[in-house]
Amino acid sequence: MNFLLSDLSLNALPTLWLTLAETATKTAADVVSVNPLKGPVEYVATFLFALAILHTFVVKQFAKLAHKYPEGSIMENLFHFLAETEIVFGIWAAVLFLTIGVMKLSVQSAVDYIEGLNFTEPKFVLVVMVVAATRPVVNLAETIILFLARLLPLKETVSFYIAALSFGALFGSFITEPAAMTLLALLLKRRYFDQGISKTLAYATIGLLFVNVSIGGTLTHFAAPPVLMVAGKWGWGTWHMASNFGWRAVASCLCSTLLVVLCFWKQLNSLEVDKTEQQKVPGWLTGLHLMFLATIVALAHHPDVFFGVFMMFLGLVTATKEYQDPLKLKEGLLVGFFLAGLVTMGSLQEHWLRPLIANESMTGLKMYFGATALTAITDNAALTYLGSLVEGISDQLKYALVAGAVTGGGLTVIANAPNPAGAGILQSSKAFEGTGISPVGLLLGAIPPTLMAIVFFWFVAR
């Protein structure tokens, strides 16, 4: 297997991951922007944020409206533009920019606000998505998952599904959640979403994928954004995460996946085994790709540096194009734009989120289920960051906040930073018939694995 030829690079990964762990324990204030605007602007921003969320639920209606107009007409193109999920928050962020300028009677105020934000996460997701989607990395991930799948005495279409969505989701604890999401989405698209599966199975699978990736990053303290926001301040290390969160994530991922497999056994078992042979990639090239990926992950909070590494990586890809597939640059840019819009709008939501978290009557139960629900309408990393600002919060509330944030991370596209990457890859698959991913369908598909996560993260052995 190709990955066995890359021992040198693989042996170097633990050191790089240790570097990442040290880098990632910076205070949350270093990686989240501070809101300089107060008062009426915040309320208008919340109203626009609500409109943006509503927009994500009606993109399919805009797509239908586009078909009512002549092809190439202004209205047809306008409605197609509004139907693109990845640009929703970017559109409303632009409206917010103009609104700030008007309300402050100064374009400079709007410019200062944008320049005061921290767009490191969108940049990182863009870069890591492109690197993780390259042929050498995808082939390696597929080889590992296939190895695990063949340990199960089941047809490959069933065993690969189990291995990918249970054990594969845990990759996010080591290579970061965006990278794991990208790899799994690409593999699932080719093996399942483009193979004529029903829409019901498609939504059950994407819901399972989003939830499992969200909780699957909790085995370590440096890979899941909502954990990263609090780990440094609260002194949480990898042992703390593995012993309090990680084992629950493993159990929940496995049980949720087995539940979906049982519900769709007949359909999964009837699929044709993927006969596509991996295009050969030299071991040394796979090793170099892993080295670049690990370096980018280790430098996740230094965008100027990891972008330089990314430029070098693009040079490597160009020089070895005979072993490469087309880069996912457009997809990465769209996902980065989505997250940048979310950062722009989400940074002005502290005025209503923080009081909810800091409420003196807050109990562990309220915090857990409140965080799970709130995560559906706001990025879970922003939620845990705001919680880290509350002084004197008890250990029970700390656990409840983070556990709730990761539990609800699969309910919507905006709930967890890696979700737009998965949605961007899967929405063009045959399973969705060119209509994109329905937010309602995603929500319904994510509810069963979310309930399973609730069982393990809140009710089991606490």
Per-segment meaning from a language model:
Residues 30-42, 78-86, 107-123, 238-248, ...:
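Interfacial loop-to-helix junctions that mark the boundaries of transmembrane helices
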Residues 1-3, 41-68, 140, 200-203, ...:
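Juxtamembrane and boundary regions of transmembrane helices in multi-pass small-molecule transporters
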Residues 153, 159-215, 229, 385-403, ...:
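Hydrophobic transmembrane alpha-helices that form the pore/transport pathway of multi-pass ion
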Residues 43-64, 84-102, 118-132, 183, ...:
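Hydrophobic mid-bilayer segments of alpha-helices in multi-pass membrane transport proteins
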Residues 79-148, 152-160:
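Low-complexity, highly charged intrinsically disordered N-terminal segments
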Residues 130-135, 155-156, 167-179, 211-220, ...:
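Helix-loop-helix module between adjacent transmembrane segments
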Residues 1-39:
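Short, strongly hydrophobic alpha-helical membrane anchors
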Residues 103-115, 138, 142, 289-393:
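Transmembrane helical segments that form the transport core of multi-pass membrane transport proteins
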